[in-house]
């Protein structure tokens, strides 16, 4: 968590890569909780595979029950209802604004709505999904304003220059 805090304080993005099951989710939740405790209310966007979303929500509720979290998924109509009820586009962000947890597919479908926010942090679970620079997900994520990015992966990074370049270019587009 201290490493993620250091990244934030230095205005850097990062990749948290270790073996599966070593606590990347809980560490990230602890980090976002730290930011909120310092007055950085967000908004925060966590995206990942559909199969991990309920775990993210339950871990937020378990470790940081005071932080509102929204599982932003469902049919187009269900998402529209959630936008109206939970996701005001007014500024500034208030303490009750939830951490948005959603899937890659919903980000691509609702990119125009999500682009209305200036996210303080974008967390991409299973970040190795971005190893192909030409993938649609990377193209859509570029349109969502984000101050900081963190990729999480339990899959070893391959010694493959195009894949590494894609991940690093997503994190550091100006370098």
What are these regions (language model features)?
Residues 1-175:
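ASCE P-loop NTPase motor core, strongest for the SF2 helicase catalytic module
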């Amino acid at each position: 968590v201290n490493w993620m805090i250091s990244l934030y304080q230095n205005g850097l993005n990062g990749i948290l890569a270790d073996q599966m099951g070593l606590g990347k989710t809980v560490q990230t939740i602890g980090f976002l909780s730290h930011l909120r405790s310092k007055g950085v209310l967000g908004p925060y966007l966590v995206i990942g595979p559909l199969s991990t979303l309920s775990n993210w929500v339950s871990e937020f509720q378990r470790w940081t029950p005071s932080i509102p979290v929204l599982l932003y998924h469902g049919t187009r109509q269900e998402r529209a209802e959630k936008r109206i009820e939970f996701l005001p586009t007014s500024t500034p962000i208030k303490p009750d604004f939830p951490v948005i947890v959603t899937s890659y597919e919903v980000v691509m479908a609702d990119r125009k709505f999500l682009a209305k926010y200036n996210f303080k942090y974008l967390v991409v679970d299973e970040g190795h999904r971005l190893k192909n620079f030409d993938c649609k997900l990377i193209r859509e994520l570029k349109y969502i304003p984000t101050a900081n990015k963190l990729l999480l992966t339990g899959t070893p990074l391959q010694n493959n220059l195009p894949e590494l370049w894609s991940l690093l270019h997503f994190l550091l587009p100006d370098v």
